Amino acid sequence: MKAFLVALVVAIELTLVFAGCPTIVSKNRWGGQQASQVQYTVKPLKYVIIHHTSTPTCTNEDDCSRRLVNIQDYHMNRLDFDDIGYNFMIGGDGQIYEGAGWHKEGAHARGWNSKSLGIGFIGDFQTNLPSSKQLDAGKKFLECAVEKGEIEDTYKLIGARTVRPTDSPGTLLFREIQTWRGFTRNP
């Protein structure tokens, strides 16, 4: 009985600690393929790199799932990546979608993949901001990643354009993330 009560208390504490964590739509649920090869990372990661997918946005799980299947197909079959390049993606519906996932190296920023978590906002944010649902989900996801010990408490948040020649994460999203916790121009 004592062991049961201890287990129950631990379960309740974990629920309270991670209560703010958004649900993550698994790769299996959105119809993604498994990676052809995996390189693992060591947590906690020091950097978070924000991207946009340069695609139309999506507003519900079915639409986002179709978009992700297409992105993964492009990454794996055209760019010869082992998986979709991002660790996680955030849809216009405000849901977090699993990409390469936790503890796995993405293919989103050459030279930075082993030490960063790559988050792709689904859409093109050169002239439009992501939805408020996307932005809120992004902030909550980062808080959750810190709470879970996946990224350092003093993580550095950067836009993809800071570490490689690209417009990503788009002009307006880049401007937005400059107001977020951990943002730096000089990683």
UniProtKB/Swiss-Prot annotation:
Family: Belongs to the N-acetylmuramoyl-L-alanine amidase 2 family.
Transmembrane segments: none
Record organism: Holotrichia diomphalia (Korean black chafer)
Cited SUPFAM superfamilies: N-acetylmuramoyl-L-alanine amidase-like
Main location: secreted
Annotated coiled-coil segments of the chain: none
Cell compartments where the protein resides: Secreted
GO cellular component: extracellular region
GO terms of molecular function: N-acetylmuramoyl-L-alanine amidase activity; peptidoglycan binding; zinc ion binding
Keyword annotations from UniProtKB, A to Z: Disulfide bond, Immunity, Innate immunity, Secreted, Signal
Leader sequence segment: 1-19
Top-level taxon: Eukaryota
UniProt entry tagged with the keyword Metal-binding: no
Organs and tissues of expression: Localizes to plasma (at protein level).
GO biological process: innate immune response; peptidoglycan catabolic process
N-acetylmuramoyl-L-alanine amidase domain ranges (all copies): 43-170
PANTHER family on file: PEPTIDOGLYCAN RECOGNITION PROTEIN (PTHR11022), PEPTIDOGLYCAN-RECOGNITION PROTEIN SA (PTHR11022:SF74)
Protein's name according to its UniProt entry: Peptidoglycan-recognition protein 2
